[in-house]
Amino acid sequence: MKWNMNLISRDDVKTKLDRKDSFKLVMVLSEWAYRSKHIPGSMHIATPEEALARLAKDDDIVVYCSGYNCIASVNAYEYLVRHGYTHVRRYAGGIIDWEEAGYPLEGEMVREETNA
């Protein structure tokens, strides 16, 4: 099935975070990848069943994974829409795009910057 996917840009995600908008930013990669680095404010969801349990159908949801070629966020988007979630968007650029912009990350693999 071909989806007309709702996308959100890097700058729009950053604006939503800066404004402290009420939305669920969901990283759909492995637990290891999430612990290594993720966008601040993200939650990790490992399975479709966990998504259904932790997300309400009327939540404002943004799913992302590693980058433009990562299919995990496409699959998560399609799964949620198929299950009646009405406010789902995909941040296609993911971690790679976010990091290239110099935006902050959290996690065990994030280098701490020294501001001297």
Can you describe what each PLM-predicted range is?
Residues D18, F23, I45-G67:
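Mobile, glycine- and charge-enriched loop segments
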Residues S42-P48, T86-R90:
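Short hydrophobic/aromatic-enriched beta-strand-loop microsegments
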Residues G84-H87, I96-A116:
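Charged, elongated alpha-helical/coil segments that serve as electrostatic interaction surfaces
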